[in-house]
Amino acid sequence: MNKKTVRDIDVKGKRVFCRVDFNVPMQNGVVTDDTRIRAALPTIQYLMEQGAKVILASHLGRPKGKVVEEMRLNAVAERLSELLGKRVVKTDEAYGDTVKAAIAEMNEGDVLLLENVRFYPGEEKNDPELAKAFAELADVYVNDAFGAAHRAHASTEGIAHHLPAVAGFLMEKEIEVLGKALSNPDRPFTAIIGGAKVKDKIGVIENLLDKVDNLIIGGGLAYTFVKALGHEIGKSLLEEDKIDLAKSFMEKAKEKGVNFYMPVDAVVADDFSNDANKKVVNIDEIPSDWEGLDIGPKTRELYRDVILKSKLVIWNGPMGVFEMDAFAEGTKAVAQALADAKDTYTVIGGGDSAAAVEKFGLANKMDHISTGGGASLEFMEGKQLPGVVALNDK
């Protein structure tokens, strides 16, 4: 990675504004999944050990520029205190005189968590005044929030213009793993693209067709490709306006010598519910009033074989409606194949795929699980991420 990291600067005695991604699920004022908090610990602990005064900033949810009581970060501060074994001071604002006073009280190795940065309308607008106000709190800026790196916000991009700006360890790992996959992959390189909508994955498919050996398609978006081949798909998800695009993707794959894998059978149901009647049919035999909600057993075997023969696999998007147990088998089979693939480097592209490997208890068998759904998607589209671009070059 050609960006400076926390290793490249001296932080002893300095106030370090560290943007993290603590956008964690909460219920009744308690953090229900602390994965993202844990992911930031190596950077936080390193800064503490180096004698920095660590000022943490994060968003939580979508308060839309105003204070929403249940989106305060108090519960996050409590959980972080437990994980660090040290009291974390939490302020009720994210900048201003009371925050400056709290920072003035800090000793080397202390940790302070600012209030939810999205309580201020200027955050998502990347307001230069707010960016300056954040910068006034610190001597150094560290961005460890890969999950927000695709956003040009005041705390992810604007602030970096006012302070020495470097990447944290999580940001560094994300960029290195995804960067190597896209620029210098081990082969055979397979991408598995699922999810509901073709339109959400157009950029990714376009970019990956130039890089992969195998492209595997699943999830709701597969039915637009099935339709493009001239098959009837019943009531399955269809994007009429993307049929021609699906055709062109398949043609491009052929031109480039990319193996393009699509479902050969499907689990169909007579209703979108866990209790619906369901059956397995060949992909060209979907009944007119049924809908495909998962890949079938023949497809699972086919995809498993491709995965086991690959040296690198990136997975983004589920194979079916895995939130319903009746239609989770396809997604589970892919997760299991990745777990069983011993000589394969497995990269899970955040979002639903990350949730799926967690759900099936296979997360610890994956080589890299991205912490950013949207950010990893844009990175895989070949886009520059504003939060990364703004950091100092080596």
From Swiss-Prot:
Binding residue positions for substrate: 21-23, 36, 59-62, 118, 151
CDD domains attached to this UniProt entry: Phosphoglycerate_kinase (cd00318)
Gene Ontology terms: cellular component: cytosol
Phosphoserine: modified positions: 183
Catalysed reaction, written as an equation: (2R)-3-phosphoglycerate + ATP = (2R)-3-phospho-glyceroyl phosphate + ADP
EC number: 2.7.2.3
Location (main, coarse): cytoplasm
Domain of life: Bacteria
Alphabetical list of InterPro entries matching this protein: Phosphoglycerate_kinase, Phosphoglycerate_kinase_CS, Phosphoglycerate_kinase_N, Phosphoglycerate_kinase_sf
Compartments where found: Cytoplasm
Pathway assignment: Carbohydrate degradation; glycolysis; pyruvate from D-glyceraldehyde 3-phosphate: step 2/5
GO biological process, one term: gluconeogenesis
UniProt keyword annotations, A-Z: ATP-binding, Cytoplasm, Glycolysis, Kinase, Nucleotide-binding, Phosphoprotein, Transferase
Statement: the UniProt record of this protein carries the keyword Cytoplasm: yes
GO molecular function: ADP binding; ATP binding; phosphoglycerate kinase activity
Subunit structure and binding partners: Monomer.
Database matches in PANTHER family: PHOSPHOGLYCERATE KINASE, PHOSPHOGLYCERATE KINASE 1, CHLOROPLASTIC-RELATED
Protein name per Swiss-Prot or TrEMBL: Phosphoglycerate kinase
